[in-house]
Amino acid sequence: MKEKPIFPLLLSMSLPMVISMAVNSLYNIVDSYFVAKISEDAMTALSLVFPIQNFINAVAIGFGVGINAMIAQYLGAGRRDKADEALTQGMVLAVIHGIVMMILCIIGIPYFLRLFTTDANVIALGVRYATIVFSFSVILSVNLTFEKMNQAIGNMKITMISLLIGCVLNIILDPMIIFGIGPFPELGIAGAALATGFGQCVPIVIYIAAYLKRPKRVAFRREYLHLTREVTKRLYSIGVPAILNMALTSVLTTALNAILAAFSQTYVLVLGIYYKLQTFLYMPANGIIQGMRPLIGYNYGAGEHKRVEQLYRLTLLLNICIMTAGMILCLTIPGKLMGAFAENPQTIQNGVIALHIICFGFILSAVSVTACGALEGLGKGIPSLLISLSRYVVLIIPLALIFSRFFGAAGVWHAFCVTETLSAVFAVIIYRRSVKAESFIEAE
């Protein structure tokens, strides 16, 4: 990880993640497509559940980032014993997180949905979907711990294969369970939730089989099952900011849903569809960041500061290219993108307007997301969190409130663009200040 040329090394680490995450995004698109065929109420319910579903993912993925960073840094420093300790205690805590999230979210989802709609059918559909999906929270947490472990040691192929098989199973099961094809009963939105859960079970089997069969660069060890203050504190110091980074999307979505609901339920649906599309458009960039993060952590642990900065700059360039392609898609075929999830002409038209406005912030968003990923890889969780706070809370929510008073729902879409511009400037400042003490950036 500290000797190979930067570009092929980053590609070898990122490409499997880009492929697997692209397929995962495709699943989310397909899942939403089939749910939209049930009814517009079902799609609205899915959109309203999304913030809580995203929060559960944020806890699992964000804490996994802490596990990933510690393993990579300890291996880079030649401390295999500490890497094993971080992995073992990280898994114990991940299981605890999954249990707590499952219980709290299942209990709280009916009350959450009533904050945004009084439609009894939408609430019933949302509760039905969420109860099933949230029941798989422990499985999700264990899955993501294995995923981050494999990423930390550079074993991207296992991660790719596991995600691919799980996502393909989801895509196959979705229409069969939703609409009652073949031997399956017609379960509607509950079928979509079950397909998601079943798809999450398969990767665990693959991860365990690979772990037992392959030579272990890092391993679970019984003597490390007892939680220690040092490791737990370190895991949370990296993991909590990463969790908050991702959970802020839920805060933002919830706030924007409340603002848009005052105009029309249609705009809530448009926002939900946009986030489905955004997931697909941003996934290649996120895949590259997934590949960059352990490389930066490993080279940081090995004292290769120059390579850390080279990895950051190359990742930023690649992500700018990806975001440019996303902007072009939203400008050229917005109607087709929205039409995949909505049949109402007014909903599609409102969505086209939203995409035309929001997409101009895509390119600048590459600066913020790349800086966050690099700082997380370095174990600098607080600076990364500050960047995310600017994007998801501090700027966009007040701007959306103000702009919506003057421009209606369109003001919310304009708030996205202004926020990405200001956040990009802030991200550059935070990143450079954070790494200056480490002498990553060479004097010009």
Residue ranges and their predicted role:
Residues 55-58, 170-175, 204-208, 280-283, ...:
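Hydrophobic transmembrane alpha-helices of multi-pass small-molecule transporters
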Residues 64, 68, 133-151, 159-167, ...:
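Short runs within selected transmembrane alpha-helices of multi-pass transporters and secretion channels
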Residues 22, 26-44, 113-120, 176-187, ...:
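Helix-terminus/linker motif at the lipid-water interface of multi-pass membrane proteins
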Residues 43-103, 140-159, 257, 270-328, ...:
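Small-residue-rich hydrophobic transmembrane alpha-helices
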Residues 1-14, 71-138, 184-240, 296-361, ...:
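Short alpha-helical transmembrane segments in multi-pass integral membrane proteins
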Residues 12-31, 132, 166, 199-203, ...:
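Transmembrane helical elements of multi-pass membrane transporters/channels
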Residues 17, 21, 33, 69, ...:
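Transmembrane alpha-helix boundary and packing residues in multipass membrane permease domains
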Residues 3, 7-26, 30, 52-59, ...:
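Residue-level signal for short hydrophobic patches within transmembrane helices
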